[in-house]
Amino acid sequence: RSRIRTSISAIAIAVAIIAVVFARGLISGMIDSTFENHINYKAGHIRVIDKEYKLKERLFSLNYVLDGFNGEGTSIMIEKLKQVEGVKQVVPRLKFGAVVSMEDELVGMMGWGVDPAEEIAFTRIDEKIIEGRMVELGSREIVMGTGLLEKIDRVVGDKVTILYTTPFGSFKGSTFQIVGKVQSAIQMLDDTIFYLPLDQAQRILEMPGEVTELLLITSNQYKAASILPGLNALFSQEDKTGKYILQVWNKDYELIGLFEIVTKIYNFVYIFIILLACFVLVNTLIMIVNERTREIGMMSALGLSSREILYLFTMEGAIIGVIGSAIGTVLGGILTKVFSVVGIDYTAAMEGMSGG
């Protein structure tokens, strides 16, 4: 019976360790993936925007944009930002709302005017293009997400006329050739986003030298805040209007702050699971001791002290714990590795949520 209870204790500990290792791997992976997408498609490591744009970003406002320090253009601004210690890359983007007219409906979408070279270096978007290629500066061409192409019934090689509104209120249309199809890990982006060369976006929107945001990239995302003093010094010297603000990826976004709180909560859950497994082990040892009172009496008669007898039972519990932990760690690691390669399909769970 002691062997059965010992085995049950080892199995309980192993199961607890497997649960902790797998859950921690799964949740950490999901959070890291969320952080990566947030950085790539939203915030960079530090984002430079107009302070008014922050309030009207959801409206795709083009009235509060970056036009450089004191209106000198973003090209000079980018060069000055690159000179700040710690800034490895500056990624410009010009985001705007647009529509494509179908027979009986208007399909809404969002255009991203980008520098192809900078975008490839930052987000590796070329690896996500499953057909065709990335856009090139100076060319009237676009890359669309897989879902968006299906919505407008187009394929790579077709031309499409996109309707949009300029900052001056003019409603215009421009025709582009579709040169690539992109499929990212975020279905909502694939259903709504198209990329075009930054110079073409600035031309059609009548916004020469202007962008909606600049993403600053550092060598370590978790140390991005350390370069703020240098950036603040530059902006205090160059930005006389004081209209620009700096947003750090993990400090100025409420959602990311919530994820950090969730991580701490899960750490307490992991500890609680381990404590439950320890309780099973302690309970088993108590039952073993109660069943072996005669054996304990014989050990006392042979001259073993109470401390030595306690030591023997403690070592027995430690061995059970080590064996269970080792088995759980190995199996949990294997399980986590398998799912990290195979992945988990959330399509059914997320069905109907992508349109938000």
What function would you assign to each model-found segment?
Residues 220-279, 288-290, 299, 312:
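Peri-transmembrane interface segments
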Residues 76-177, 203-205:
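Short acidic/glycine-enriched loop/turn elements at secondary-structure junctions
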Residues 4-30, 260-295, 318-330:
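Hydrophobic alpha-helical transmembrane segments of multi-pass inner-membrane transport and secretion
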Residues 133, 147, 154-239:
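Basic-flanked hydrophobic alpha-helices used for secretion and membrane insertion
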Residues 24-110, 133, 138:
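Hydrophobic, regular-secondary-structure patches
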Residues 155, 305-306:
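Short coil/turn motifs that cap or connect alpha-helices
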Residues 327-356:
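Short helix-loop junctions at transmembrane helix boundaries
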